[in-house]
Amino acid sequence: MLILRGAPALSAFRHGKLLEQLTQHVPAVTGLYAEFAHFADVTGALTADEEQVLARLLKYGPSVPVQEPSGRLFLVVPRFGTISPWSSKASDIARNCGLAKIDRLERGIAYYVQGELSESDAQQVAARLHDRMTQLVLDRLEGAAELFSHAQPRPLTAVDVLGGGRAALEKANVELGLALAEDEIDYLLKSFGELGRNPHDVELMMFAQANSEHCRHKIFNASWDIDGQAQDKSLFGMIKNTYEMNREGVLSAYKDNAAVIVGHVAGRFFPDPQTREYAASREPVQILMKVETHNHPTAIAPFPGASTGSGGEIRDEGATGRGAKPKAGLTGFTVSNLQIPGFEQPWEVPYGKPERIVTALDIMVEGPLGGAAFNNEFGRPALTGYFRTFEQKIATPHGEEVRGYHKPIMLAGGMGNIRDEHVQKGEISVGAKLIVLGGPAMLIGLGGGAASSMATGASSADLDFASVQRDNPEMERRCQEVIDRCWQLGERNPISFIHDVGAGGLSNALPELINDGGRGGRFELRAVPNDEPGMSPLEIWCNESQERYVLSVDAADFETFKAICERERCPFAVVGEAIEQRQLTVADSHFDNKPVDMPLEVLLGKAPRMHRAVTREAELGDDFDAAGLELQESVERVLRHPAVASKSFLITIGDRTITGLVARDQMVGPWQVPVADCAVTATSFDVYTGEAMAMGERTPLALLDAPASGRMAIGETVTNLAAARVGKLSDIKLSANWMAAAGHPGEDARLYDTVKAVGMELCPELGITIPVGKDSMSMKTRWQDNGEDKSVTSPVSLIVTGFAPVADVRQSLTPQLRLDKGETDLILIDLGRGKNRLGGSILAQVHGKLGRAVPDVDDAEDLKAFFAVIQGLNADGHILAYHDRSDGGLITSVLEMAFAGHCGVELNLDALADSREELAAVLFSEELGAVIQVREGATPEVLAQFSAAGLDDCVAVIGQPVNGYEINLNYNGETVYSAQRRILQRIWSETSYQIQRLRDNADCAEQEFDALLDEDNPGLSIKLSYDVNDDIAAPYIKKGVRPKVAILREQGVNGQVEMAAAFDRAGFAAIDVHMSDILAGRVDLDAFKGLVACGGFSYGDVLGAGEGWAKSILFNARARDGFQAFFARKDSFALGVCNGCQMMSNLHELIPGTEFWPHFVRNRSEQFEARVAMVQVQESSSIFLQGMAGSRLPIAIAHGEGHAEFESEEALLEADLSGCVSLRFVDNHGKVTEAYPANPNGSPRGITGLSSRDGRVTIMMPHPERVFRAVQNSWRPDDWQEDGGWLRMFRNARVWVD
């Protein structure tokens, strides 16, 4: 084994943070230094050249001075017997660089901790430095040699039920954490008695997973008695009622990994499977929809819990039908009180938590990063979500209880697209090859399905921790590329049947695959790809290693499938074959036995149906009188409540422009304020139709009136989706995610009544269908605190997500108030008809109360009429701004509109209140409704339309937006409240700032927070030196010649499709080229005029951003020669964007005239930054930017490592003086800046784009390919038509070629 020292592992900021954490828990720690340590398992001595290549490979990341370490060594390495994702990718790169003697590379972090540490101190330090699920701590570097030793496989064990009977099974139930119910134990005893043999541990674990509440939804399929009355429908039956009442527009419901609804016809853009040239295929583009929860893992380990939650939901979408494509995501969190140190709020009363779970604050610091990181690396924009905190001590008939979310809700969902012919699964033929696609088996996530079905606290802490999975999004991206190549073959798609691997691992996925396909299966355990050879059969078969799919491919199609996998470098293995007989057999060639051999009927058949006998309990609540509250204090408290406050910290970490199909994200207007009501995507690049999604949830109401909370969740989803041009209300389809603490007094009945209110009453009345959903029935946390029993129980929680096809994405309404449209009015539409009920409101919560009467959907006809009128007014162009009323009430809706419009507001409340005592209820009640801005001249017509729809009593003109900074509320001729907008916006933003300060570079967080004080900030703006509508490439396109441009990608790249679309629009033939094509000699760059390296996460960025990709070119003779020859040609051009920019900056030795180019390293904020930033085009040599110099315009930014690090001050000066700096960040005032967030990565002198001296090669961190259409821009001027400002760049390249 070779040991190679690496660069320092922590930036100054991260170092300071970790040292602070360590000293807080172990005061004896006085200092810390950390560096990477690399270990190479070699088959022979390396030559001097090979040593040099290896040394260069392992030199990556920012240039930080290396120290001579001192202190006690804590070497954190992957667990022995495992292969980390870093190792597999780095080893791939080494092989591609010709280092054949390197069997494997692995990496650890060597922490040198200074201080007089006792053994107990050392144990505490070690615990805080590693993830015990995937890592261990050594005290010497040489100990890492054990990383490369291979453990012997552990054997199978049997449970002696024939001899030991029920007691043996009960013992196994506890030891293995199976969570089997009494009747399931009876069932297993009977089944194995009939088989005449003892069950193996693997069979019991498999049964427990497949039949867990998590997988089987026993409560939703149960029979019910409530108060002694038999109920005639199951919960699931009542949900299905919505489909039975209205099937229109639903293509697949309740039977696949996601539901499918009807979309629009468009030109679906992808490469031709034969020629590899991108083109549009005109066809129906159907919409798939799915929302999952990952609550249990997120409570234990928030980053991997939320990350794998998003990853699992993405796999659900990809594994729908015969293969589909995920498109846009959403994330939601509900947690208990945050209690941010130094920022504790008056309503937050500390209650404690069990050791096994993390705090609500930890969840909100780490969890969103996990969800965002997976979406970012996979390449899916995260476009909407929600965040709520709730934790309150309340009086009940059984005494005081704490209700809240110590077991959090972590929601991951999204939508995608699927071809019409692939909506339904195909047939599994006898003899079909059964395949595992994706990553290897690892000993992680064991028993996750069963664990998430228990109340937190009912299992041991070790089992809890073992049930959390770990993530590798780059692997999932490779799998998706394989699935994409398959569905793009149309009728020749080799996939006949596909499922994702989730809860229960292969033990759930493979039986489900063959069972759903009407077959049995014969499997070989040792064929399963396995990175931990020491695992037992149970561990191989049941672990929940992520990024895997199971599928069936007919023998005749196997070579096609194999070739696709090899080109995409995606691991796969044939693990079995389909058989006629409905038997499940798993053979183990190592031990020459059969760990599993049972009829599918025993595993998935007639397990006993659950019966619930429950009673209703009195509704809860307390008296809450808002009349006497001080208005200013109430406004400030409400604005600081996380459900109301800015969600910016959740949003800027997630890429919102990837795909180039995003028409409406969370950030609104020139000031990019996070207040959008819904997310909207375009169907494709050639149409204005699209898809919308939005969420609704009002969970605290369930403590007072559970059915009302369900109705309000649906109502809020409708009022949010009303902002999109949907058409008719019945076009909306819902996903319903149900959470409850089953078994807690009164909760089962509340759940039943809520499902009934939604499924049997409101949805049928609205004509809305719920074709998909999920349930989590163990929302309770129990623990002991110094001998005292404690528990936190969540309310019945329905989270609703609505999806709908959109007629015109350009007509998506936003809350941004407009001052450039003449005199205007604000109109309130109050669907509560003046009731202004405050029960369960944020106002009540911030004063430590619940209240009693809650908002409700009193009349479905009102909601239907509201939706129809808003859609009509939008179609007619009457609505300038729209915002629904929700958490925080009317005052919050109006303030958020003012924040987005950067203006003041004059409100007149005379029409809304009969007395001053009623003002608090008017301002803070959360009844359904909306505020719209219309031109003053259109107000009579708008009011008349509402009146004609029967909503006369619901509408009132309540004020006007005004120039300036003042928010004034007037009643009976006097001003009852006045405040400056910027002060209120800072209060609204402070919760987000406080979390950002803890999580990211605190200096950057402070700069962004202070930027809100700039009243004169003009926002985003456009100043062009060219005509955006002038198609300078048109004369060349008319010649019919389409020069070829290689759209180059490496494994992990995810931005190729929109890049191809931009070049295609400019008149190029865009060709899909994978690095594997070049390394194998299938493609020669001589055939191309242009080469574009696209954005993404090549090799998961394991050897530095873009560096592994670059080095696989530099140190591979064939690739190096090909690229060097291409760059030397005077008729060639190249572009590198984001990851492609990072990669090309490392190829400067091959690209003439680029010796001064920088290296791109971690952003100064230490965070992935996804923003719309202003850039100025410089006078430069770049062929792409000719005629654009002096232009200032917004552009999409999405990167974690975009800081330009020059080799020296001289190199920076050389770049500046050479005329090769092509783009710089500027602030909204137009000045070049290094200040955050206008310069999101902190690059010196705002530099974010450069070119070679002759201008043929340009690199840039921003993404022009995502905003070449006007409609792709988060904000755009009203006079832009089809073309966006950045299309000129691609047209310039087309002109240059001729």
From Swiss-Prot:
Q: Where does ATP bind?
A: 305-316, 384-386, 676, 886
The identity of this protein, by name, is Phosphoribosylformylglycinamidine synthase
What is the E.C. number? 6.3.5.3
Please list the residue ranges annotated as the Glutamine amidotransferase type-1 domain. 1045-1298
The UniProt entry, under SUPFAM superfamilies, shows: Class I glutamine amidotransferase-like, FGAM synthase PurL, linker domain, PurM C-terminal domain-like, PurM N-terminal domain-like, PurS-like
Q: Which domain of life is it from?
A: Bacteria
Instruction: Quote the record's binding site residues for Mg(2+).
Output: 677, 716, 720, 884
Gene Ontology biological process terms, A to Z: 'de novo' IMP biosynthetic process; purine nucleotide biosynthetic process
Q: Which InterPro entries match?
A: Class_I_gatase-like, FGAR-AT_N, FGAR-AT_PurM_N-like, PurL_large, PurL_linker, PurM-like_C_dom, PurM-like_C_sf, PurM-like_N_sf
Which family does the record claim for this protein?
A: In the N-terminal section; belongs to the FGAMS family.
NCBIfam families in the record, alphabetically? FGAM_synt (TIGR01735), PRK05297.1 (NF003672)
Query: Do the record's keywords include Cytoplasm?
Result: yes
- Function recorded in the entry: Phosphoribosylformylglycinamidine synthase involved in the purines biosynthetic pathway. Catalyzes the ATP-dependent conversion of formylglycinamide ribonucleotide (FGAR) and glutamine to yield formylglycinamidine ribonucleotide (FGAM) and glutamate.
Q: Name one GO cellular component term.
A: cytoplasm
The UniProt annotation puts the region (Disordered) at 298-328
Q: What pathway does the UniProt record associate with this protein?
A: Purine metabolism; IMP biosynthesis via de novo pathway; 5-amino-1-(5-phospho-D-ribosyl)imidazole from N(2)-formyl-N(1)-(5-phospho-D-ribosyl)glycinamide: step 1/2
Report keywords, A-Z. ATP-binding, Cytoplasm, Glutamine amidotransferase, Ligase, Magnesium, Metal-binding, Nucleotide-binding, Purine biosynthesis
Chief subcellular location equals cytoplasm
